[in-house]
Amino acid sequence: KDPSKAAAIGTMLQAGGMVSSASDNLVFPYSTDPGNQNPKYELIELVGGTQILFFASNYMLKPMQERNDPRIPCYFEPGADGVYRGLGNREPAETDDKDNMLSSVVSSYLFRKDAPELIYSCQEQLLLEAEAYARGLGVAQNLSKANELYKKGVREACAFYGVAENDIDTYVTGLPELTTVTPENALYEIHMQQWIDLMDRPFE
């Protein structure tokens, strides 16, 4: 949003040397040892050990469903009937006539004891670089380069959550080719993947 930063962005892109693989991820580790467990796990333990505090938002779940995103079961639990259902803002959770939960909660996988806290990642870097090339920020606009970085970023994002390689291949193959859409739509797809990737991150 600050045009004066474009040149600096271009210089960094040309220089390289930034986060370039999962081994470079900035991660705060937790373990299964008491006193060193993920605070999200400890929060759920404080309220009885059942995760019914945090639900799937339709603003996240629906775009993932539209794209057949393989991260859905990593992010959310299905309802008691096996269906993934998100909630709108201020919408109450849905149950069946036996009080079984039908609305999807955030997955126990994300609330496990030793779930690491991801601070900055390879996929975040790749998607930011894809955005820069799609917008022409400090570099010539290049949707082919943006597409390459976008696909790599999505692969890394899925792999971080343990999605099987075959499922990643299927998903990435089905994503739009950014070279075949308008620059505006290319940016939309990049931003959507950034949004999905940051689901389990704090607002800051």
Predicted stretch roles:
Residues K5-E129, A134-R135, Q141-D197, F203:
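Hydrophobic-face positions in mid-chain alpha helices that act as interaction patches
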